[in-house]
Amino acid sequence: MEEVQRRQHPHPRRSLKKLSEDSLTKQPEEVFDVLEKLGEGSYGSVFKAIHKESGQVVAIKQVPVESDLQEIIKEISIMQQCDSPHVVKYYGSYFKNTDLWIVMEYCGAGSVSDLIRIRNKTLTEDEIATILQSTLKGLEYLHFMRKIHRDIKAGNILLNNEGHAKLADFGVAGQLTDTMAKRNTVIGTPFWMAPEVIQEIGYNCVADIWSLGISAIEMAEGKPPYADIHPMRAIFMIPTNPPPTFRKPELWTDEFTDFVKQCLVKNPEQRAAATQLLQHPFIKNAKPVSILRDLITDMMEIKLKRQEEQQRDLDQDDEENSEEDDMDSGTMVRASAEDTGTMRAASTLSDGARTMIEHDSSTLDSQMGTMVINSGEDEEDGTMKRKEETIQQSKPSFLEYFEQKEKENQANSHSNRNAQALQNSSDNWKVPQDGDFESLKSWSVEELQRRLASLDPTMEQEIEEIRQRYQAKRQPILDAIDAKKRWQQNF
């Protein structure tokens, strides 16, 4: 395995600190060899590449310029200002056709989320403590620089081949200034969002600490709290419910449980800061990053095995196709005496005599399938895959749901009218509060089903109100940005 890693990542001739002015004036293909697509990040696709001059492996995010350029520039600006071993480094950027190429540090082991998913195993307390220690150091640095990440989760904590964790994906990160000390916009990933972020009451750096606590549970259990329910429902539950904890608390030590508890304090003023949490016994006693190397090696071996299996399947398919080509030499088909047609049904021909074939509907799917599109579940196994190229916009990921539901509402106005009727019929009943469900016992099954059906229209109405409130706050900012751009052009 070490030999494979050396072969895939030869030692660079010199360490790349920053791209030279000369390099930045060239076309990116002259400076880098792009090797393969790694996946999707905020606003664009991420590729693995080699810097030709130094031989160093880098990551390149390619972002279509029709994406929210303001957010992209913000991400670059934040990365440019950061110089920490616990934050992904930024080397430079290019414009190429309609894309912006952002050149960043390559983390060969991928994200902590990848580590869990590919191995199909959650992490131990020791492994979690080691990862969280590096993550907290990254957060301490960011918060000292008066920056909020705003999207901390296992998928945005990257690991290099040595096991060092680094914060990445600053697509929604924000700068704190003296004149704007608090944010009041809902940005981030719903399951990891702090209550004060959802409630739009203003927040600061400790919003990242709540997300870190949720990420700790994610590493331990494989998914964050509320992951099994709809994100929209989670948004309403997070601010009102008690802080989440482990599904099976008895599996975890008191130190780990207390660490998570200190992260998940609902009142942000009472929540611990990164510097304080670095002194927590769970973090202070963390083991060195060397304990993560076996996990990383295990993951890479699994990926390599999948690639080899896939290559064998491809080779086997090529051999079968080659044999069929050798056998398929018939161009003239002898018809039976009663058959005078020139176009024949596929079922009447032998395998080796297909010149002009009329397929019926039953044979079309089975005999004419040439390009197979893998399902999204087989991410690691396909060589030719259809990848969704949708770009994440500069809004909370869950707000895409609002837009989708709005389209569905327009297309299904009739069903909406029925839903409204249900909503009207339910106006005279009260939702049980604080777990008091005694009143439900007196209702009939039909009544319970009717009232359950009325909940969704109510939720959609509340969601629409949130969307409109968000848009009302967002539009003046966009107008101000446009005004500043026009002013700069005039001067």
Swiss-Prot record:
<keyword id="KW-0053">Apoptosis</keyword>
<feature type="compositionally biased region" description="Acidic residues">
    <location>
        <begin position="315"/>
        <end position="328"/>
    </location>
</feature>
<dbReference type="InterPro" id="IPR011009">
    <property type="entry name" value="Kinase-like_dom_sf"/>
</dbReference>
<keyword id="KW-0175">Coiled coil</keyword>
<dbReference type="GO" id="GO:0106310">
    <property type="term" value="F:protein serine kinase activity"/>
</dbReference>
<feature type="binding site">
    <location>
        <begin position="38"/>
        <end position="46"/>
    </location>
    <ligand>
        <name>ATP</name>
    </ligand>
</feature>
<dbReference type="Pfam" id="PF11629">
    <property type="entry name" value="Mst1_SARAH"/>
</dbReference>
<feature type="modified residue" description="Phosphothreonine; by autocatalysis">
    <location>
        <position position="185"/>
    </location>
</feature>
<dbReference type="GO" id="GO:0005524">
    <property type="term" value="F:ATP binding"/>
</dbReference>
<feature type="compositionally biased region" description="Polar residues">
    <location>
        <begin position="410"/>
        <end position="428"/>
    </location>
</feature>
<dbReference type="GO" id="GO:0035329">
    <property type="term" value="P:hippo signaling"/>
</dbReference>
<dbReference type="InterPro" id="IPR017441">
    <property type="entry name" value="Protein_kinase_ATP_BS"/>
</dbReference>
<keyword id="KW-0723">Serine/threonine-protein kinase</keyword>
<keyword id="KW-0547">Nucleotide-binding</keyword>
<dbReference type="GO" id="GO:0046872">
    <property type="term" value="F:metal ion binding"/>
</dbReference>
<feature type="coiled-coil region">
    <location>
        <begin position="292"/>
        <end position="334"/>
    </location>
</feature>
<feature type="domain" description="Protein kinase">
    <location>
        <begin position="32"/>
        <end position="283"/>
    </location>
</feature>
<keyword id="KW-0460">Magnesium</keyword>
<dbReference type="InterPro" id="IPR000719">
    <property type="entry name" value="Prot_kinase_dom"/>
</dbReference>
<feature type="domain" description="SARAH">
    <location>
        <begin position="437"/>
        <end position="484"/>
    </location>
</feature>
<dbReference type="InterPro" id="IPR024205">
    <property type="entry name" value="Mst1_2_SARAH_domain"/>
</dbReference>
<comment type="similarity">
    <text>Belongs to the protein kinase superfamily. STE Ser/Thr protein kinase family. STE20 subfamily.</text>
</comment>
<keyword id="KW-0597">Phosphoprotein</keyword>
<protein>
    <recommendedName>
        <fullName>Serine/threonine-protein kinase 3/4</fullName>
        <ecNumber>2.7.11.1</ecNumber>
    </recommendedName>
</protein>
<dbReference type="Pfam" id="PF00069">
    <property type="entry name" value="Pkinase"/>
</dbReference>
<comment type="subunit">
    <text>Homodimer; mediated via the coiled-coil region.</text>
</comment>
<dbReference type="GO" id="GO:0005737">
    <property type="term" value="C:cytoplasm"/>
</dbReference>
<feature type="site" description="Cleavage; by caspase-3">
    <location>
        <begin position="328"/>
        <end position="329"/>
    </location>
</feature>
<feature type="compositionally biased region" description="Basic residues">
    <location>
        <begin position="7"/>
        <end position="17"/>
    </location>
</feature>
<feature type="region of interest" description="Disordered">
    <location>
        <begin position="307"/>
        <end position="394"/>
    </location>
</feature>
<dbReference type="InterPro" id="IPR050629">
    <property type="entry name" value="STE20/SPS1-PAK"/>
</dbReference>
<dbReference type="InterPro" id="IPR011524">
    <property type="entry name" value="SARAH_dom"/>
</dbReference>
<keyword id="KW-0539">Nucleus</keyword>
<feature type="binding site">
    <location>
        <position position="61"/>
    </location>
    <ligand>
        <name>ATP</name>
    </ligand>
</feature>
<dbReference type="GO" id="GO:0005634">
    <property type="term" value="C:nucleus"/>
</dbReference>
<keyword id="KW-0808">Transferase</keyword>
<feature type="active site" description="Proton acceptor">
    <location>
        <position position="151"/>
    </location>
</feature>
<comment type="function">
    <text>Stress-activated, pro-apoptotic kinase which, following caspase-cleavage, enters the nucleus and induces chromatin condensation followed by internucleosomal DNA fragmentation. Key component of the Hippo signaling pathway which plays a pivotal role in organ size control and tumor suppression by restricting proliferation and promoting apoptosis.</text>
</comment>
<keyword id="KW-0479">Metal-binding</keyword>
<keyword id="KW-0067">ATP-binding</keyword>
<feature type="region of interest" description="Disordered">
    <location>
        <begin position="1"/>
        <end position="24"/>
    </location>
</feature>
<dbReference type="GO" id="GO:0004674">
    <property type="term" value="F:protein serine/threonine kinase activity"/>
</dbReference>
